[in-house]
Amino acid sequence: KDSATTTKDVEVKNYVLKSVAQNKTNELAATIDGATKNIKASEVTIKTPDNVVLPVKSVSVDSKDATKVTLTTFSDMNDGKEYTVTLDGTTVNFVATDNKVASINIDKPTIPVKTETEIKLVAKDANGVILKELPYGTSDVNYDFSLTTANGYVNGSKLYLNKVGDTATAEITYKTNKYTADGKADGNIGPNKLTITATDQATVSSFK
């Protein structure tokens, strides 16, 4: 009885791209199996709907979970269209943000006591994609941002509070600079008043 042995070439992938979601206009959160620490920016291909390749600026692997990989691009992806991400022969699609501001907030509701801490305005779309991070004191035609405290001081973009429990007030507004026929602001968000509180170092949190 003759027996024939068939040899089959099995393609072994170094990485398997499982999913992609957008964090910021120029940042993607990818889930990737494999030795992710070895991924080079040049190995990841991101294409626009018109097949234009967007170069990847950096690849960053989460220190606690190696399947969580952040891909940063030089260009913004904010036209609401479908993009493709390819790595090691696997392609995953995602729809980019439409760049429409749905919410505004500050990045830190609490700051460490007696420590100068930068405060940023954060604007997000309806899906939570960060569209803008604006440090206090940076002028932008679409945003108003005031920061006041009687219990410390503001130095540039940084806030300092004297003791635990002391507060500052941030007031933020998003402006479309568009108006209705009767002259009212159209599509603005705010003004939102938010409180920032000084806490001891161990309990500091940030909005995610």
Label each residue range with its predicted role.
Residues 25-28, 112-120, 166-170:
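Short, solvent-exposed loop/turn segments enriched in Ser/Thr/Gly
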Residues 36, 125-127:
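Short, acidic/polar linear motifs in exposed loop/turn regions
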Residues 56, 80, 114-116, 133, ...:
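Beta-strand-connecting loops/turns
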Residues 60-66:
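Short proline/glycine- and polar residue-rich coil/turn motifs
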Residues 71-76, 155-165:
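Short, hydrophobic beta-strand segments
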